[in-house]
């Protein structure tokens, strides 16, 4: 179900830590991070103008981290719709920092960027996170304990 107002997004309802409070967006740490530094840039209005400004600020943030040598590169992107993996039905931009050597064999793949083996396989079966993760991600089909369909 699409969320109608910014005040109703889970990050606000759960009083999640706000890392940056910009004019058009807020930045929160991702509750299910792919790696350290995985952030969500969330526009305050669901409009093209606010989404565009949020994307622009995400890029500026990443470029600054690269220019200052804090990271080597970054991914950013949006999941639009449940089939694409969206679980919070309000636009938000994922920012995933990257470091040289963080993935063996296939550098650059965001699917392999999970430090400490985090991702669906980790959160979906971890005793501390399993119930909440599966509730928030109902579209993932769990075959049995230990395997994704």
Feature locations, PLM:
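HIT superfamily nucleotide-processing domains
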Residues: 1-149
């Amino acid at each position: 179900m699409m969320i109608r107002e910014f005040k109703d997004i889970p990050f606000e309802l759960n009083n999640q830590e706000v890392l940056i409070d910009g004019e058009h967006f807020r930045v929160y740490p991702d509750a299910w991070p792919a790696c350290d530094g995985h952030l969500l840039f969330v526009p305050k209005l669901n409009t093209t103008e606010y989404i565009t400004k949020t994307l622009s600020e995400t890029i500026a943030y990443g470029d600054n981290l690269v220019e200052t040598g804090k990271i080597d590169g970054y991914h950013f992107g949006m999941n639009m719709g449940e089939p694409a993996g969206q679980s919070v039905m309000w636009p938000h931009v994922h920012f995933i920092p990257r470091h040289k050597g963080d993935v063996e064999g296939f550098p650059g793949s965001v699917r392999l960027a999970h430090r400490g083996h985090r991702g669906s396989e980790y959160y979906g079966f971890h005793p501390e996170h399993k119930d909440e993760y599966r509730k928030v991600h109902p579209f993932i089909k769990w075959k049995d304990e230990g395997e994704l369909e």
